[in-house]
Amino acid sequence: MNWKGIIFLFITSLSWSQNFYLKAEGSSLNETKVLDSIGYTKKHTSVQSIIDENKSLGNQLTQAGFLASQLLKNKKANDSTFVFYYSLGTKTQNLKIKTDLLTEEIKSTLGLTTDRIVLISETESFLNTQLAILERKGYALAKLRLENFTQENNQLQAFLIVDLNIIRKINSLVFKGYDNFPKGVKKVYERKYKQKPFNQELVKNINRDFNTLPFVIQPKFPEVLLTKDSTQVYIYLEKRKNNSFDGFIGFGTNEEKQKLQFNGYLDLNLFNNLNSGERFNLYWKNDGNKQSTFNVNLDLAYVFQSPVAIKGNLKIFKQDTIFQNSSFDLDLGYMIRYNTKVYLGIKDNTSEAIQKVSTSTIKDLKSSFYTTTFEHRKNNYENDLFPEQFYLLTKFGIGSRTLSSEKSNQFFGQIQALQLLPLNTKNYIHLKSDLYYLQSPDYYTNELYRFGGIKSIRGFNENSLQGNIFGGIFAEYRYIVASNLYVHTITDFGYFQDKANTTSSNLYGFGFGLGLLNKGGVFNLVYANGSSNGQAIKLSNSIVQVSFKTTF
């Protein structure tokens, strides 16, 4: 390489403040075409940049198989253009990587039972692939190199040398920042990762697992401490504030009973307050007129420091002075991951006709089911406006109903799903669906599935509809106006069948809404109008729902 010429060009160009141009030419027209095809950078802001590009071009020629290429000379064509003349020599197509110096154990580990022939341009990729194989098997500090290069019949040959070092296994997970991190969760992840062969992919998996936990934040990526005889992974955690409250309570006088009557609603979610990964939900609503709902739910995670989960739910629903339903669910589950669970359980329902007046559609009855449930959710807490990305719940139950000491076999199935589809950074499609089916010899109003309202098909009062079959899809187009504000449309479709009252109908809900995020929580406003069986939409039937969910 003509370094004296390059130094001269550098010195004579120090005073210039302009663009410089590099031109590479070969010993023939074909060689010049090869140089152009490599795609070197021609425009530069300094002579030093041209010198660096020359080094890069030399490396690219070597990788392309021109092992004997050399820079013959360079010259300054004018004040801003420098020409470099190359001789490329004969192109070597292949490299034969010989494995004679490898032990049988290393050959077996890498799957290299014979010599391997690769393109010169793919040599680096081949070595990186072999290094990744060793790393996955725990040889985190392994090194690979090629030695003793020889040329034979236009083919380059070299011996592969592998320095394995020792197998690295994760000895411990060290938790920093959250001293009261749930012991059950900690034990499960320690059992999952301790003594596993250490590699970078495993560290990424650890990071991914802890990012899925809704009650912690990882302020930085896990770090690894390698000592002579141990491998420790340091996981940095902070407790996330994930409790929420939404509701209001009012009171008035019941004109019929002349008694004080409370109305309003309350939706309270408590998450990991006992530092065990538990979730508690209390929901109460009384519209002051015909309906009241009380629902309490408790999820326990990693019980006895194992993948066991326990979930219990109590729900009481009262319809005016007509009937009252009580249901109790108890499930024992296995946690595939924190957000992926399967359950086996029991479900008991009791329904009582309050007025004790026998009708053809409302009866005192009890039912019991053995159930199986699958639940999976995916959240992205870096997305403040739309943290819930995906949700799937499937629940099936088989059992019997008792009515006047007469038993009837029953079966039910339910599928609920949610999917957030990002179109780009400002536009999203939000889809929810709810499918329910009850199979029975006959049906009564007070045992049917109830739906309608802001969490179901919008434009209808909450729980104002019922059916033994229901299917609905609830769609929103969401547009982000600002980092803390979005607006959305409402397009809901549904169908239900009510065999207790021999009716069925298509349902439609249309409207719009907005969501506003602030330091205290999320404010939501929804305006929706519903219709059934193609009836005309009337503005007088519109429903406006306002909520403010506070996080703490």
For each of these PLM feature ranges, what is it?
Residues M1-A24, F552:
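Bacterial Sec-dependent N-terminal signal peptides
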Residues S17, N263, N295, F390-F552:
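C-terminal transmembrane beta-barrel domains of outer membrane proteins
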Residues Q18-L29, I38-T253, D267, N281-G288, ...:
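Periplasmic polypeptide-binding modules associated with outer-membrane biogenesis and secretion
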Residues V34-L35:
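Select transmembrane alpha-helical segments in multipass membrane proteins
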Residues N54, L127, T372, Q414-I415:
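Short, hydrophobic/amphipathic alpha-helical packing segments
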Residues Y139-L144, N325-S327, F411:
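Amphipathic hydrophobic-ligand
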Residues N199, I206-L393, R450-G453, N463-G467, ...:
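Gram-negative/organellar outer-membrane beta-barrel architecture
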